[in-house]
C-alpha cells in the first residue's frame, strides 16, 4: 500500500492520539482507470481499518489548484492531524514519467479532509520528493523548472522559504 524507500519514510505514521495512518500510492497516478489514493486509518487499540477515518483523496479538490491528486508520492506528519505531502497529478504526467513535473506540494488536514496547495514550492518530478522535518518545519526537496533545491515550510503560518539551491536533482537529504 505504500513506498518502502527512505525518502518516503513518512508514509506510515501515528498521530497524537496514537492512531496509525498509512498513505497509499494508487498506481503512482499512472493508471487513469484507478486513481484511488489517500490514507487508511487503524485507530489506537483497534486491529481493523476504520472506513470513516480512512480517506480516498483522489475525489477531493485541492485548494489553489485545478486538478485532483492521483497518488501520494511522499508524506510527513507535522502534527495536529496535518500532513505535508507530494501528490501526483495525472494531468501533468508526460510521456516520460521520470522527468515530468507532476508532483505537487500540499498540506492535508486529516480531520477536516481538506487539501491545500503549498504556494512557493515548485512542481517537481517523481524522484525529487523527499520531505523531512526540521524542528516544527517541513523541508521539501524540489527539482522545479525555475527553482531547484530545498524549501522550508512552516505549517503554522504557511510561510515558505528556499533554504538552498542545488545543481541537479535533490532526491535525498
What role is predicted for each listed range?
Residues 1, 35-47, 100-111, 152-154:
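Beta-propeller blade signature
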Residues 5, 53-72, 115-133, 159-172:
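Conserved blade-ending motifs and adjacent loop-strand segments that build the rim/top face
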Residues 17, 36, 102, 145-147:
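Surface-exposed loop/turn positions within WD40 beta-propeller blades
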Residues 66-143:
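Loop/turn-rich, solvent-exposed surfaces of beta-rich toroidal or solenoidal domains
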Residues 17, 111-112, 156-157:
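Residue-level recognition of short loop/turn positions
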Residues 28, 47, 91, 146-147:
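Surface-exposed, flexible loop/turn segments at secondary-structure boundaries
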Residues 1-81:
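Acidic, serine/threonine- and glycine-rich low-complexity intrinsically disordered segments
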